[in-house]
Amino acid sequence: HGHYLDRHTTVPTYERLAAGALARALRAPTHAAAGADDYERVLAPLYALIDAAAARAGDGRRAPDGASVRAWRALAGERRNRWRRTALAGGFALGIAGLNRAGVGPLRAELSGDELRRAALRAMGEVVARLGVDARHVVFGHTHRTGPLPGDDRDEWALAGGATLMNAGSWVYEHVYVDRPWGNPYWPGGAVELDAGGEPRLRRLLEGADPAALTAPLAPARA
Protein backbone atom coordinates (compact mmCIF):
# COMPACT_ATOMS: atom_id res chain seq x y z
CA HIS A 1 0.00 0.00 0.00
CA GLY A 2 2.75 2.47 0.81
CA HIS A 3 2.10 3.24 4.46
CA TYR A 4 5.57 1.95 5.35
CA LEU A 5 6.92 5.23 3.96
CA ASP A 6 5.46 6.98 7.03
CA ARG A 7 8.56 5.86 8.93
CA HIS A 8 10.84 7.72 6.52
CA THR A 9 9.07 10.74 5.08
CA THR A 10 10.42 14.12 6.15
CA VAL A 11 6.97 15.76 5.91
CA PRO A 12 5.62 16.21 9.46
CA THR A 13 2.24 14.57 8.93
CA TYR A 14 0.23 13.21 11.84
CA GLU A 15 1.19 9.66 10.82
CA ARG A 16 4.89 10.53 10.58
CA LEU A 17 4.98 12.22 13.98
CA ALA A 18 3.05 9.41 15.62
CA ALA A 19 5.29 6.80 14.02
CA GLY A 20 8.40 8.65 15.18
CA ALA A 21 7.13 8.95 18.74
CA LEU A 22 5.99 5.32 18.86
CA ALA A 23 9.31 4.12 17.46
CA ARG A 24 11.10 5.91 20.30
CA ALA A 25 8.74 4.44 22.88
CA LEU A 26 9.24 0.93 21.49
CA ARG A 27 12.99 1.41 21.05
CA ALA A 28 12.61 0.54 17.40
CA PRO A 29 14.72 3.14 15.56
CA THR A 30 13.93 3.72 11.92
CA HIS A 31 17.53 3.18 10.86
CA ALA A 32 17.24 -0.41 12.14
CA ALA A 33 14.16 -1.27 10.05
CA ALA A 34 15.12 -4.16 7.79
CA GLY A 35 11.95 -6.18 7.21
CA ALA A 36 8.17 -6.06 7.20
CA ASP A 37 7.98 -7.04 10.88
CA ASP A 38 10.06 -3.98 11.82
CA TYR A 39 7.60 -1.72 10.02
CA GLU A 40 4.50 -3.47 11.32
CA ARG A 41 5.70 -3.32 14.92
CA VAL A 42 5.52 0.46 14.84
CA LEU A 43 2.80 1.13 12.28
CA ALA A 44 0.20 -1.57 13.02
CA PRO A 45 -0.92 -0.04 16.36
CA LEU A 46 -1.03 3.42 14.78
CA TYR A 47 -3.20 2.38 11.86
CA ALA A 48 -5.47 0.30 14.08
CA LEU A 49 -6.17 3.50 16.01
CA ILE A 50 -6.79 5.48 12.81
CA ASP A 51 -9.12 2.77 11.51
CA ALA A 52 -11.10 2.79 14.75
CA ALA A 53 -11.42 6.58 14.58
CA ALA A 54 -12.59 6.43 10.96
CA ALA A 55 -15.19 3.81 11.86
CA ARG A 56 -16.81 6.25 14.29
CA ALA A 57 -17.88 8.45 11.36
CA GLY A 58 -18.88 5.66 9.02
CA ASP A 59 -21.94 7.39 7.57
CA GLY A 60 -20.28 8.32 4.28
CA ARG A 61 -19.73 11.97 5.15
CA ARG A 62 -16.26 13.44 5.25
CA ALA A 63 -14.89 14.50 8.59
CA PRO A 64 -14.15 18.15 9.37
CA ASP A 65 -10.57 19.23 8.79
CA GLY A 66 -8.24 17.99 11.49
CA ALA A 67 -5.41 19.84 13.19
CA SER A 68 -2.82 18.85 10.59
CA VAL A 69 -4.97 20.14 7.72
CA ARG A 70 -5.70 23.41 9.52
CA ALA A 71 -1.98 23.85 10.16
CA TRP A 72 -1.15 23.13 6.52
CA ARG A 73 -3.71 25.69 5.35
CA ALA A 74 -2.29 28.32 7.68
CA LEU A 75 1.30 27.68 6.59
CA ALA A 76 0.64 27.32 2.86
CA GLY A 77 -2.29 29.69 2.58
CA GLU A 78 -3.15 32.57 0.32
CA ARG A 79 -0.87 35.56 -0.26
CA ARG A 80 -3.19 37.94 1.53
CA ASN A 81 -2.15 36.27 4.77
CA ARG A 82 1.57 36.66 4.00
CA TRP A 83 2.63 38.26 7.28
CA ARG A 84 0.64 35.87 9.42
CA ARG A 85 1.93 32.96 7.39
CA THR A 86 5.53 34.16 7.77
CA ALA A 87 5.16 34.36 11.53
CA LEU A 88 3.57 30.92 11.69
CA ALA A 89 6.28 29.47 9.46
CA GLY A 90 8.96 30.74 11.83
CA GLY A 91 7.31 29.03 14.77
CA PHE A 92 6.74 25.92 12.69
CA ALA A 93 10.43 25.73 11.78
CA LEU A 94 11.38 26.01 15.45
CA GLY A 95 8.94 23.24 16.30
CA ILE A 96 10.40 20.98 13.62
CA ALA A 97 13.91 21.67 14.91
CA GLY A 98 12.76 20.67 18.39
CA LEU A 99 11.26 17.42 17.11
CA ASN A 100 14.50 16.62 15.30
CA ARG A 101 16.49 17.23 18.49
CA ALA A 102 14.09 14.96 20.36
CA GLY A 103 14.81 12.13 17.93
CA VAL A 104 11.41 12.07 16.22
CA GLY A 105 12.84 13.15 12.85
CA PRO A 106 14.47 13.68 10.51
CA LEU A 107 11.79 16.16 9.47
CA ARG A 108 11.79 19.25 7.26
CA ALA A 109 9.80 22.45 7.65
CA GLU A 110 8.86 22.49 3.96
CA LEU A 111 5.27 22.00 2.81
CA SER A 112 5.36 22.96 -0.86
CA GLY A 113 3.73 20.77 -3.47
CA ASP A 114 7.12 19.81 -4.87
CA GLU A 115 8.41 18.79 -1.46
CA LEU A 116 5.31 16.74 -0.63
CA ARG A 117 5.92 14.76 -3.81
CA ARG A 118 9.68 14.42 -3.44
CA ALA A 119 9.54 13.48 0.23
CA ALA A 120 7.11 10.65 -0.50
CA LEU A 121 9.28 9.35 -3.34
CA ARG A 122 12.43 9.49 -1.22
CA ALA A 123 10.65 7.67 1.59
CA MET A 124 9.22 4.97 -0.67
CA GLY A 125 12.63 4.48 -2.22
CA GLU A 126 14.02 3.91 1.27
CA VAL A 127 11.33 1.30 1.97
CA VAL A 128 12.09 -0.52 -1.29
CA ALA A 129 15.80 -0.61 -0.47
CA ARG A 130 15.31 -1.80 3.12
CA LEU A 131 12.86 -4.54 2.15
CA GLY A 132 15.10 -5.67 -0.70
CA VAL A 133 12.32 -5.43 -3.27
CA ASP A 134 13.69 -6.77 -6.55
CA ALA A 135 11.35 -5.43 -9.22
CA ARG A 136 11.41 -3.25 -12.29
CA HIS A 137 8.27 -1.41 -11.20
CA VAL A 138 6.99 -0.66 -7.70
CA VAL A 139 3.33 0.41 -7.50
CA PHE A 140 2.21 2.10 -4.29
CA GLY A 141 -0.38 4.51 -2.95
CA HIS A 142 -1.08 6.09 0.44
CA THR A 143 0.13 9.62 -0.35
CA HIS A 144 -2.72 10.16 -2.87
CA ARG A 145 -0.38 11.91 -5.32
CA THR A 146 -0.83 10.17 -8.68
CA GLY A 147 2.26 9.79 -10.81
CA PRO A 148 4.40 9.93 -12.72
CA LEU A 149 2.23 12.21 -14.85
CA PRO A 150 3.10 14.04 -18.07
CA GLY A 151 5.37 16.89 -17.05
CA ASP A 152 6.78 15.10 -14.01
CA ASP A 153 10.54 14.66 -13.80
CA ARG A 154 10.92 10.92 -14.45
CA ASP A 155 14.28 10.91 -12.67
CA GLU A 156 12.46 11.61 -9.40
CA TRP A 157 10.50 8.39 -9.84
CA ALA A 158 13.53 6.24 -10.69
CA LEU A 159 15.35 4.40 -7.91
CA ALA A 160 19.07 3.78 -7.66
CA GLY A 161 18.60 0.03 -8.09
CA GLY A 162 16.86 0.49 -11.44
CA ALA A 163 13.22 0.23 -10.35
CA THR A 164 10.61 2.82 -11.24
CA LEU A 165 7.98 4.03 -8.77
CA MET A 166 4.35 4.49 -9.75
CA ASN A 167 1.68 5.96 -7.47
CA ALA A 168 -1.90 4.90 -8.19
CA GLY A 169 -3.27 7.98 -6.41
CA SER A 170 -6.55 7.66 -4.55
CA TRP A 171 -10.32 7.52 -4.75
CA VAL A 172 -10.82 10.24 -2.17
CA TYR A 173 -11.68 13.83 -3.13
CA GLU A 174 -8.92 15.68 -1.24
CA HIS A 175 -10.55 19.11 -1.21
CA VAL A 176 -7.54 20.69 0.50
CA TYR A 177 -5.10 19.64 -2.22
CA VAL A 178 -7.38 19.72 -5.26
CA ASP A 179 -8.15 23.37 -4.52
CA ARG A 180 -4.45 24.24 -4.80
CA PRO A 181 -2.90 25.39 -8.13
CA TRP A 182 -0.85 22.19 -8.23
CA GLY A 183 -3.77 20.06 -7.10
CA ASN A 184 -4.50 18.12 -10.27
CA PRO A 185 -2.15 15.21 -9.37
CA TYR A 186 -4.40 14.62 -6.35
CA TRP A 187 -7.56 14.34 -8.43
CA PRO A 188 -9.31 11.08 -7.46
CA GLY A 189 -9.80 8.09 -9.70
CA GLY A 190 -6.23 6.96 -10.22
CA ALA A 191 -5.57 3.35 -11.22
CA VAL A 192 -2.74 1.26 -12.58
CA GLU A 193 -3.48 -1.21 -15.37
CA LEU A 194 -1.38 -4.36 -15.41
CA ASP A 195 -1.16 -7.23 -17.85
CA ALA A 196 1.15 -10.19 -18.20
CA GLY A 197 4.60 -9.15 -19.29
CA GLY A 198 3.67 -5.56 -20.11
CA GLU A 199 4.55 -2.23 -18.58
CA PRO A 200 2.16 -0.87 -15.93
CA ARG A 201 -0.02 1.94 -17.25
CA LEU A 202 -1.37 4.78 -15.16
CA ARG A 203 -5.04 5.61 -15.70
CA ARG A 204 -7.12 8.61 -14.58
CA LEU A 205 -10.64 7.20 -14.52
CA LEU A 206 -12.45 10.28 -13.20
CA GLU A 207 -10.91 12.98 -15.39
CA GLY A 208 -13.56 15.55 -16.24
CA ALA A 209 -15.94 14.44 -13.49
CA ASP A 210 -18.04 17.10 -11.78
CA PRO A 211 -16.42 17.95 -8.41
CA ALA A 212 -19.88 18.26 -6.84
CA ALA A 213 -20.48 14.60 -7.63
CA LEU A 214 -17.24 13.58 -5.90
CA THR A 215 -17.43 15.60 -2.69
CA ALA A 216 -19.10 13.99 0.31
CA PRO A 217 -21.20 16.23 2.58
CA LEU A 218 -19.39 17.55 5.62
CA ALA A 219 -20.06 15.59 8.79
CA PRO A 220 -20.79 17.57 11.95
CA ALA A 221 -17.93 17.84 14.41
CA ARG A 222 -18.17 15.48 17.35
CA ALA A 223 -18.01 16.80 20.88
Residue ranges with predicted function:
Residues 2-223:
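Extended recognition/assembly regions associated with phosphoester-bond processing machinery
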